[in-house]
Amino acid sequence: MKFVFILGDAAVGKMTVGQELMKITDLRLFHNHMTIEPVIEIFGRYDGKTISEMREVIFRNFAASENYGMIFTYMMAFDQPSEWNYIEHVKKIFEPYGTEFYYVELIAPQDVRLARNVSENRLKNKPSKRDVETSNNRLLNDDKNYRCVSYEGEVPFENYLRIENSDKEPEEVAKFIKERFHL
């Protein structure tokens, strides 16, 4: 099995690149809002514990399946030890199945991400982003409070790509990932 982490800042294009990568491989996409949105809808608020538990069930069952692999998108704060621990936790679920891991970090400046924050695809797939003012404010606050871009050389993983995707189409990025990692 193959497991592709697509990491990066808010609205950098993780889900969209993941959608395109899924189209050209046998990988299945599990973008982070696939658990966030139902929890918000059902509970009327964000509930991190429930979201984590839902992800755990999906990861455990998928790892034990006969599927080719998974793409998982995750907004990672590289300055938070708990984020690194979470990546390791997810890996531990899949490691007993001989999974190969790949890591893609997408990078784009804030102005590009603010423009992408209101894209049709994003708003269609992430209802919680439809209050654009709140969503933009959250993005700006996250930029102030967290470092969601790695430093050069900081990421210790094998099979790691760092892609500045400001001026690249999602299809182009997905094709590059597929070719580079032989997915």
Language model segments and positions:
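Glycine-rich phosphate-binding loop used to anchor ATP phosphates in small-molecule kinases
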Residues: T50-E105
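Small-molecule kinase domains that catalyze NTP-dependent phosphoryl transfer to phosphate-bearing small molecules
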Residues: L123-V173
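Walker A/P-loop
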Residues: M15
